[in-house]
Amino acid sequence: MPFDVQFLKVFDGVLMLFERAKAVFPGGVNSPARALKHLPTPLVAKAASGPYLYTDRGRLVDFCLAFGAIILGHAHPKVRRAVEEQLARGWIYALLTEEEVLFAEKIRAHVPSVEKMRFVNSGTEATMNAVRLARGFTGRDYIIKFDGNFHGSHDYVLVKAGSGAATWGIPTSAGIPSDVVKMTVVVPYNDVDAFVKAVREVGDRLAAVIVEPIAGNYGLILPEVEFLKALREETERVGALLIFDEVITGFRVGLGGAQGLYGVVPDLTTLGKVIGGGFPIGVFGGKSFIMDLVAPQGPVYNAGTFNAHPVSIAAGLAVLEELEGGQVYSVANDAARRMAEGIRDLAERVGFDVVVKHIASMFQFYFKKGDVKTPQDVRESNEKLYLKLHELAIGHGVYLAPSQFEVNFTSAAHTAEVVEEALGALEKVFRELRREVGGNS
């Protein structure tokens, strides 16, 4: 059967499935980032293994990796075996297990600031409870967050950034009462002066500052070290807590996370993604005397039937054991470095202005001149060009992060051969993009 006829048959089937999906899900998907609105239909996953996704568009080298949840590679045999062994013993008890204690001990060994912790089921739950705990501990109500930082979909943090140095309580979602977010202040990321000014304005009403130490939800924005140090100094000065949201960076940029990388120690930390091995999990934790306020020991309430779910714990233990072996980071980090260098070189050769950002096993690129140091720099990039490249890349067997506001990731399965395969495909993509749009970005 000719390829074009086969393609039409596949596309027609996906179109029918998407219509069925739209009949039962808002927008046809169960999370907005999966909608891929720049494509005729969302991608439909069939399977995943190693560095590859198998979809209705064929086999794709995956650089999205479930938005950073996968670091060993898809369907890693040790994770699969650990999960199968747990399933054979039962998959939910709602009781204490030895495995969750062992998992917590391993996390604490690598992230010493997390002396005690509570397992929850997502990054959103983790940050929501961390903010609640900070308010309960300090007896204060106000929090500061940063433009371009995403901390989940709960009401405390869905707050807009404005045009001034600080924005006070403007919800980013319908359905959030203004009274809920009026005590959330948004400040520009990487701007020490604006942050110090906001802290002085809030003063002794400030309960916490929550930040992504490496911003990974608005593209990839690396922190100025002095910015992170200022967060620590100012929160200590006014008696507020510093919360590092390491849902993306925890165990991704190293065993000690971003706090280990930069040497800035928070009071509370949130974790997720990598530590679940692809299964739902979240963690909030910190100094013992703060965490002791969490129920049942203290008055700050958290509970959940699925907290410390045995299957997620089993997967997480398998992942941490692999990470402790040392080879995962060297392979994954080298892959991201080579992808970043390769994309920069390809764009230059074809005649596009790009800015490439990279750290550990994370990278992203932007069609623009200059540099990317703030969310505003990301907003000023050519998003349409990125989306067109993303669409073309799928046709050549590469699945990149679906927006310039997301991040590309690599795993231990992204060997030198896989990177070479991806860069070979992207060379064709960049040349095709150049023919379509012409000129510089």
Swiss-Prot record:
Known catalytic reactions: (S)-4-amino-5-oxopentanoate = 5-aminolevulinate
Tagged with keyword Cytoplasm: yes
E.C. no: 5.4.3.8
Recorded metabolic or biological pathway in which this protein acts: Porphyrin-containing compound metabolism; protoporphyrin-IX biosynthesis; 5-aminolevulinate from L-glutamyl-tRNA(Glu): step 2/2
Source taxon at top rank: Archaea
Subcellular location field: Cytoplasm
EC supergroup of this enzyme: isomerase
Main location (coarse class): cytoplasm
Any one biological process term the GO annotation gives: protoporphyrinogen IX biosynthetic process
Co-factor(s): pyridoxal 5'-phosphate
Transmembrane region(s): none
Keyword annotations: Cytoplasm, Isomerase, Porphyrin biosynthesis, Pyridoxal phosphate
Modification N6-(pyridoxal phosphate)lysine occurs at: K273
Coiled-coil segments on the chain, per record: none
Annotated Gene3D superfamilies: Aspartate Aminotransferase, domain 1, Type I PLP-dependent aspartate aminotransferase-like (Major domain)
GO CC, alphabetical: cytoplasm
UniProt similarity note: Belongs to the class-III pyridoxal-phosphate-dependent aminotransferase family. HemL subfamily.
Family annotation (PANTHER family): GLUTAMATE-1-SEMIALDEHYDE 2,1-AMINOMUTASE, GLUTAMATE-1-SEMIALDEHYDE 2,1-AMINOMUTASE 1, CHLOROPLASTIC-RELATED
HAMAP family: HemL_aminotrans_3 (MF_00375)
Record protein name field: Glutamate-1-semialdehyde 2,1-aminomutase
Organism name: Pyrobaculum calidifontis (strain DSM 21063 / JCM 11548 / VA1)
Origin organism lineage: Archaea, Thermoproteota, Thermoprotei, Thermoproteales, Thermoproteaceae
Gene transcribed to yield this protein: hemL
